[in-house]
């Protein structure tokens, strides 16, 4: 049986060990009214006097159904009872796609944090969310970066605002057991039960099957795998950056890559260097097919060749260099 106090102590230790938060910070908590975010709110309230935080709550109502409005009302009442600053966001349009709704939420989180001087935005993503995201991105064909996209802490606005997820080592099952003990009211958004939504299908159909027939501790195992991927990917990104800085040359105000060096390094680093080189000069992202085509041509090129990429980008490859010509000004 999981204990609320023990879990608070564990997460308090994680905050210190991973340097997620500092004392006397102004933090904005995203609260939906569901299990995970209500637990997060209560957790941070238990710790706030020790850490001397100033806490605010933000809630987003997507206007999907009456339950979202009821949940928003409940969260606003909690904020009032706890004497916390409260920010209500109401969707101006109906977002049918999850990605667009998420993008809208995070833009508002960032805007509110910026306008009201919050340095930290905290969301209630758990180890179970990390598992769902890994499968979701895996089925979309993501690389290593996509498989560990839910990270503990990341910068979202220059060096001023960071997004923090302190529950990434805690599963949804652990939280369910705790809520049976403390009996705090929750509001379940019926939209989360709609299996027509891709992520819900993973949560309610795929993962229960895998837990039943393959590993009942699947959430913990996959979350640990995502954590390993994150650490190793950070190492590879740092290594790639160091190598790219050595082989990237500025010629007539244009950045070029030394193709002779690229040919002698492992394929995995070739792909990463090419991807970094392109995405540091363009607002577009490039998928595996684009990167692999460039990598293959770079290794066999005899004559000068042009490759046309999304957004009006043209890449020139010769026997000596790779050059990106872009129509987009920054």
Swiss-Prot record:
S-S bridge residues: none
Keyword set includes tRNA processing: yes
One Pfam family named in its UniProt record: ATP_bind_3
Single GO term (MF): ATP binding
Keywords of the record: ATP-binding, Chloroplast, Ligase, Nucleotide-binding, Plastid, tRNA processing
Record bears the keyword Repeat: no
Biological process, per Gene Ontology: tRNA modification
Subcellular location: Plastid, Chloroplast
Top-level taxon of origin: Eukaryota
A GO cellular-component term linked to this record: chloroplast
Catalytic activities: cytidine(34) in tRNA(Ile2) + L-lysine + ATP = lysidine(34) in tRNA(Ile2) + AMP + diphosphate + H(+)
Residues the record lists as binding ATP: 32-37
Cross-referenced HAMAP family: tRNA_Ile_lys_synt
Family that this chain belongs to: Belongs to the tRNA(Ile)-lysidine synthase family.
The name this protein goes by in its record: tRNA(Ile)-lysidine synthase, chloroplastic
Record lineage: Eukaryota, Viridiplantae, Streptophyta, Charophyceae, Charales
Gene name, Swiss-Prot/TrEMBL: tilS
